Design a protein with these regions (language model features):
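Charged helix-capping and loop-helix junction motifs
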Residues: 85-86, 115-116, 152-158
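Active-site mouth of glycoside hydrolases
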Residues: 1-85
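Short, acidic/polar
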Residues: 6-13, 113-121, 158
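Loop/turn elements at helix/coil->beta-strand transitions in domains of secreted/extracellular proteins
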Residues: 19-25, 63-69, 95-100, 125-132, ...
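Aromatic-rich peripheral "rim/lid" segments of glycoside hydrolase catalytic domains that contact
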Residues: 93, 102, 143-271, 297-338
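Active-site clefts of carbohydrate-active enzymes
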Residues: 30-43, 98-109, 121-155
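Short, solvent-exposed loop/linker segments at beta-strand-coil boundaries, enriched for Pro/Gly
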Residues: 272-276
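Aromatic- and acid-rich polysaccharide-binding/catalytic face
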Residues: 13, 24-30, 69, 73, ...
Length: 339
């Protein structure tokens, strides 16, 4: 009766949060394991895991039909990884809607980051479920804080992972934001920790910036319209965003992180219609170019949240390119171009 006991435990959660709009879904089984079972990963997945997911979802639906159900694949035993991917491939559909495929990726090898995510995308398509990476980010070794070489290595594979996420247009959660701060010893490289802060307080303040500067990169948080593509280019500190606007959906919010990424200020290009800049010494935007009939009151800087807020795009129901670049805009002297 272990499955029934497990589901009964979930019932308390479903009852408590059935009307809570801030709880959008449930991660049904975290990193399911085979361990010592004498069974193949395919059989374990098809015969036990997927039917169990369906059983859990059937029990959850009477509480709320709008919640999302996050599912994961089998976390394989040490030594069983395929192409450095520790998670077994799901090859069979689940007969339910409202699914979110929520794999984990802890990949420090540059050559395997994109192939791993491509494998996950294949499963996402089969399941007809969007991807939310529930955990990512290789742990920090005890030696890393004092080694510039190790930190540069972390920066490289963290950036590559973030770029793949953004190119695919998926969300991801870095594990874990506050710790644990204690070190564990389960990797060949020695003791390691998941914490992104290096101090010993419960709520840290001393960031491991070789990690936090990557995960706190500029990105579109909320868009009135549809995102076609976006990418933050770390080398140039430039955010490129392409959207189809739809002002009927309300306001848009872009996380800039100016105090982290743009201590020299930044400039925003919105199509050919508008150029704004924000100096670290000023409270609001400076307008360098604006087409007629644009309501400049629709463009707001939220200092506390480090957000660029757009109440309405200059053109509705149209394709629009947005670019955020470092530094304050300087108009090119036409005489310099001619020379």
């Amino acid at each position: 009766n272990e499955q029934d006991i497990y589901i009964d435990a979930w019932r308390h959660v479903w009852e408590a949060f059935k009307d809570d709009d801030f709880v959008i879904g449930y991660d049904l089984v975290n990193e399911p394991r085979k361990l010592t079972m004498d069974i193949s990963y395919d059989e374990l997945t098809n015969r036990y895991l997927l039917p169990f997911y369906e059983k859990i979802i059937d029990a959850a639906l009477p509480y709320s039909k709008d919640k999302q159900f996050l599912i994961q694949s089998i976390f394989m035993n040490k030594g069983d990884a395929v192409k450095r991917n520790q998670y077994h491939e799901i090859k069979k559909k689940i007969n339910h809607k409202n699914l979110v495929f929520a794999p984990h990726i802890y990949q420090e090898n540059l050559d395997y980051i994109e192939p791993t995510m491509q494998r996950f995308e294949k499963e996402s398509t089969l399941l007809n479920a969007p991807i939310l990476v529930g955990e990512w980010g290789f742990p920090t070794f005890v030696t890393t804080d004092n080694s510039t070489t190790e930190q540069l290595n972390y920066i490289e594979f963290y950036i590559r992972t973030a770029e793949v996420f953004d190119r695919m247009g998926i969300g991801a959660i870095k594990a874990w934001f506050l710790g644990n701060r204690s070190y564990q010893n389960f990797l060949p490289g020695g003791e390691s920790t998941w914490a992104i802060f290096s101090d010993k307080q419960a709520v840290g303040t001393v960031e491991r910036k070789y990690i936090t500067d990557i995960i706190a990169r500029p990105y579109p948080q909320l868009i009135a319209g549809d995102i076609e593509q976006f990418m933050f280019h770390f080398a140039t500190r430039t955010l490129d965003l392409s959207i189809q606007t739809d002002n009927s959906r309300g306001a848009s919010k872009l996380f800039i992180g100016a105090d982290r990424h743009y201590p020299d200020g930044f400039t925003i290009h919105i199509g050919e219609q508008l150029i704004l800049s924000k100096s670290p010494l000023s409270m609001g935007f400076k307008v360098h170019h604006s087409e007629a009939n644009i309501d400049l009151g629709n463009f707001v800087w939220d200092e506390s949240r480090q957000q660029f807020v757009v109440l309405a795009w200059p053109k509705d129901k149209s394709q629009l390119s947005i670019q955020i670049k470092p530094g304050i805009y300087k108009k090119t002297d036409p005489m310099a171009k001619n020379n």
